[in-house]
């Protein structure tokens, strides 16, 4: 009849929402200003295929960020969405590790591994803490 209010760790919620907001901001920059964003991340000048793939990734980040922020009032949904976000960050880190084998991609590859892994670590921390108190 009455649902018990689930306690939410405020720090974990804040971290999850910051990850969502950062993902939206970066995704928007990549989607709307693809070449300047890629240059800022030290990628070599992309061709049309690279620009298209970067825009796909930017769009993905916008949507995952929006889903994260939209789940701010629902602890169970926020936990599920941050898990998806974390898995995407791990996949990104793996893709960057593979790309870093190419000398032209070494700097953006290593940077991508570090940033993807850091985001996943923070996200998994939040995910674990959002699991209920």
Task: Give short role names for the model-derived ranges.
Residues 1-133:
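Short amphipathic, positively biased membrane-proximal segments
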